[in-house]
Amino acid sequence: MQPEHVAGANMPNAVGNHDPMMRQTVTVILAGGRGSRLEPLTRDRAKPAVPIGGAYRIIDFVLSNCLNSDMRRLLLLTQYKAQSLDRHINVAWRNYFCRELGEFIDVVPPQQRIDDNWYQGTADAVYQNIYAIEREAPEYVVILAGDHLYKMNYESMVNFHHRKGADVTVGALRVSREEARQFGVMQVDTDNRLVEFQEKPENPRPTLDDPDVCLASMGIYVFNTRFLFERLCDDATQPDSDHDFGKNIIPGAIEDSQVFAFPFTDENRKRDAYWRDVGTLEAYYEANMDLVGVDPQLNLYDRQWPIRSFQPQLPPPKFVFGSEGRSSRRGEALDSIVCQGAIISGGCVRRSVIGTGCRINSYAQVEDSILFDDVNVGRHSRIRRAIIDKGVQIPPETEIGYDLALDRARGLTVTDSGLVVIARGEMIASPVSTNGSHDPTSSLTS
């Protein structure tokens, strides 16, 4: 299955091309995911609002793709603990869209316009917002997931959909057979027409050209608007339906409609295509650690396909205290990302992501870790393989990630791989008791 080359598909920074077809398109972004496997990071925020790479949120990648693809009519469907996401959209994204030119990014919580239920599935979420789509009178509706990391030109997919005369087009990604069990798996003919679709099969069928590779659905769809409305309205009347695009809408459409697969066109400009579902703590951690490498797989430095976000009005990061004689008091960070407003004040940072406003105090060590905004690490503390949420205060002389049994006893989240996670609002008692000695029983309380 080979991607078709279309005019403008590889043009640098497609913003401003103003393809008339994109003006006939409304984009619906599903951003209400609970992200339960990312707990406790999603205890107070939806999965798309989880920070990534220090300066971004997960949602910024799909929104940047939209803007770079000249898609400027966006409906963002939220549901679960959306306040953090709502605030981020307001401060980071509103100014990119001009209402006077018919552009918008609207955050749409469940309206209960049709019945008293919350969203019951991906298809039901769109069904409950047919009114919001219909009033814009689009010819095409693009449906995206708001919780994946990748760089893609959606304009190419819409043009492909139009040329094929498709009713629906599904974004397709080549994955290993082992990975394919977590996806919807497709079979296509020589014209990229879907002939079979299985949702998360136990024994996925490989592609015809490679017995070790499967064609997986990316959860990205282009629909003809009228066709979409008809299928959603019919699905809503089916009591045994899961009201899900992968389980119900797409398999049903294959039987009697023009359904095509569009091969993922990567804008990452690296040797290997990049697409990640950071739905587990380990996957999330590895995606961040990739970014601090010498040559990251995810390219954040490509000015032709920028990833945008909110940039706070803070001073640049600062590193203070150099070695004085034999003292180990030296503010430094190597193989790391350090964001605005952070101060490395005599501490040492290695292979870590340091968020805005963090402070690493004298003689502290942070290794292989992710610190969200405004984390304060006390003197002589040591942190290894940890994810620390926003605003957490680490007392002096505290060790995190060195004694996993102690970390569990404190009430911290410790994964099977030994990754330690401290949630926002949790406090760590000082390891130094009132008489100045180390207290091994100090614990964490909310």
Curated annotation (Swiss-Prot):
SUPFAM superfamilies: Nucleotide-diphospho-sugar transferases, Trimeric LpxA-like enzymes. It catalyses: alpha-D-glucose 1-phosphate + ATP + H(+) = ADP-alpha-D-glucose + diphosphate. Alpha-D-glucose 1-phosphate binds at residues 119, 184, 199-200, 217. Pathway: Glycan biosynthesis; glycogen biosynthesis. Pfam families: Hexapep_GlmU, NTP_transferase. Keywords: ATP-binding, Carbohydrate metabolism, Glycogen biosynthesis, Glycogen metabolism, Nucleotide-binding, Nucleotidyltransferase, Transferase. GO terms for molecular function: ATP binding; glucose-1-phosphate adenylyltransferase activity. HAMAP family: GlgC. Its EC number is 2.7.7.27. CDD domains: ADP_Glucose_PP, LbH_G1P_AT_C. This is Glucose-1-phosphate adenylyltransferase. Homotetramer. GO terms for biological process: glycogen biosynthetic process. Belongs to the bacterial/plant glucose-1-phosphate adenylyltransferase family. Involved in the biosynthesis of ADP-glucose, a building block required for the elongation reactions to produce glycogen. Catalyzes the reaction between ATP and alpha-D-glucose 1-phosphate (G1P) to produce pyrophosphate and ADP-Glc.
